[in-house]
Amino acid sequence: MEMKKRISLELRNRSPAEVAELVLDNCRSVDGEIEGLNDSYKELEFLSMANVELKSLSKLPKLPKLRKLELSDNSISGGLDVLTERCPNITYLNLSGNKIKDLSTVEALASLKNLKSLDLFNCEITNLEDYRENIFQRLSQITYLDGFDQEDNEAPDSEEDDDDDDYDDDEEPGPRRYEAEEDEEDEESASDLGEEEEEEEEVGLSYLMKEEIRDEEDDDDYVEDGAEGEEEEEEDEEDEAAAADQGEKRKRDPEDEGDEDED
């Protein structure tokens, strides 16, 4: 796919002034030149044109906010002074896998005062004697060369990690902001869960209290029923005793009458 067509696809119905990041890797440049980019991309901060058969940067537009530029695996051999004129705020530049041979070619980057990381890996220039010492000497502003500083300490995974806080509120948040939002959501979920558990405990206690009250009422009813039963049994025993006494009296009455007749 040609670079110009690829750019139109990457816009996704946005205007060039709304684009902060543009990845054009593996498309095809025409005659090794940049095409489809213009000064309208004034908000562009990240541009990647890796493996696009690029030979020249002469048609690179003015990109005042560009901070990271990926140009790896192309055929660029010079003309780096264009970067100092049109992209003065670059902090990261990847030229690995290009045809850069001489230190004089790289010296043009000395005017990029904000440049912190430069990658020339797999370029012929890396075969020069004292290559690293010479680059650090000529480009005193850089911290990392081919991923390592002068003390051979490896660079962080991304030079943009420290720049996440620079985004405006209306721009896309960085990964840290997403993580913060996720943490807040987790805390809210945990809080909601805690409240639900408290409510469940309150409901459970209320239920137990009601059950205890019901049990006490049932015990009282049982006691009252038992007392009534005992009273009824006592009344029945009294009735039986009275009936027995009456029967004995009836037996005695005929005997008494017989005694009177004999007299």
Curated annotation (Swiss-Prot):
It is found in: Cytoplasm; Nucleus. It comes from the Eukaryota. PANTHER family: ACIDIC LEUCINE-RICH NUCLEAR PHOSPHOPROTEIN 32, ACIDIC LEUCINE-RICH NUCLEAR PHOSPHOPROTEIN 32 FAMILY MEMBER E. Residues 146-263 are annotated as: Disordered. GO terms for biological process: chromatin organization; regulation of apoptotic process. The keyword Calcium does not apply. Phosphorylated. The phosphorylation is nuclear localization signal (NLS)-dependent. The H2A.Z-interacting domain (ZID) mediates a direct interaction with H2A.Z/H2AZ1. The keyword Nucleus applies. Component of a SWR1-like complex. Interacts with H2A.Z/H2AZ1. Keywords: Chaperone, Chromatin regulator, Cytoplasm, Leucine-rich repeat, Nucleus, Phosphoprotein, Repeat. Its main location: cytoplasm. This is Acidic leucine-rich nuclear phosphoprotein 32 family member E. Residues 202-263 are annotated as: ZID domain. Residues 148-172, 180-203, 214-242 have a biased composition (Acidic residues).
